[in-house]
Amino acid sequence: MSSERKAYDVTVVGGGHNGLVAAAYLARAGLSVLVLERLAHTGGAAVSAVAFPGHPARLSRYSYLVSLMPERLVTELGLDIELASRTTASYTPTTRSGKPGGLLIERPEGPATAASFRTLTGGDEEYAAWQAFYAEVTRFAEVVAPTLLDPLPTERAIRDAAEADVWRDLVARPLGEAIERRFSDDTVRGVVATDALIGTFASLDDPSLIQNRCFLYHLIGNGTGEWRVPVGGMGAVTGALAKAATEAGAEIITSAGVSQIRAGDDSAEVTWHDGHRAHTVTSRHVLANVAPWVLRILMGEGEDPDTKPQGAQVKINLLLDRLPELKSGIDPRVAFAGTMHLAEDYSQLETAYADAVAGRVPTVMPGEIYCHSLTDPSILGDARAGMHTLTYFGIHTPAALFEQDREAHKAEAVARALAALDEHLVEPIASYVATDASGRPCIEAKVPQDVEADLAMPGGHIFHGDLDWPWASNRARLETPAQQWGVQTDHASVMVCGSGARRGGAVSGLGGHNAAQAVLGSR
């Protein structure tokens, strides 16, 4: 601790990106702010690191892309960050009747996209359906996105501003119904559906509509839904946030493990340990940038295994000597520049879900690949010419699959993930993978349990729990600033400021911004 100060206006528990956003806003408003981070560095999941000894490449190991962070937030905090657009939105390699091909979607879409749809589907109808569907999604995003930095709108307000058919397709009915009704090609259906399944374990027909909520969050960022690459890696984003917070006067202490939060009516006490001794600090407000499940434990409510979130993803980071060649003949610099969909046909997604529900690692692993170094070569450092990073995000791999014999099942999942890529490559991916200083392949894999161990996200759930609609129900109590901003807990002095907030999830800063506004509104 840089001082023996015992009281602050606000203590933020957790120095991930949302905690840093909250600290920056509150310190700029003149409040005294203390941020306590368990790890030796800030940033949480939004960090960059040298993953492979002997290579300077800095990988974004957990979080990869930015979409939901409002440009207004970046401007208000004066963040010196650059978010680069990818020239390819997505490429989906295919094999039909033994012939390799693929679906290319440019950014922005142009003649090559239309031609790719035509070649894949045999006509222009599917691309017309695609354009109509995403035009509707964009119009809905333009309704929702402007509300994200304001107090929660009601469901009625959003519904009244939306088109009735769009509300039905995206909000009222399971998303799978709209996809099956509006598209006929299995691959096209799958490309649409995958945004509903990132970090979310569900069937596309799930009556809970969790898949709809996930889809919505992935498509509303800044009203466009574009996912961009942070130049310098995800660590550049959180580095800029930490700088903004400290320059405004916030105090950040790392290697500070919080063990207890005691809430009173007008203040709360936080107990933390620096590795040598315990400290206690009192604040008018405590903002929890930890999962709500973890917060309940810190507040003395005990662990409840039945409500513990469960992540459902496999993350694989690779460093390559060169980009792989694809059997379809497409330029690898085009194919890998965006999101590459693997084994994500609609039918494959549903089959993989059924496999996982039955307790099996999916026989055919659906997932996505990103090559950030094509958009941002700076993350490679002074690596050899031709080298590239490659990141795989596998879906429908819930934590339960890895509870028993974790390493064996992890190896099985990795093998199946890479096999889904190998199917479309001229040579197996293993022949492209670089080796580290000890001669080992530059491959690291993380299942949900690894994410939990590294980042204390319960169950390895990347959103801290299931996402919720970014508006309040018509019957919601919106009497206090915390309720109005969607950051309330059962204690007036404690608020949620992370991904577990009403509009949390992804690298957006929304949880931090909204908790800060609730604090300022409570003064």
Language model features: what each stretch is:
Residues P230, A256-D382, G486:
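Mid-domain catalytic core of redox enzymes
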Residues K99-P207:
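Rossmann-like flavin
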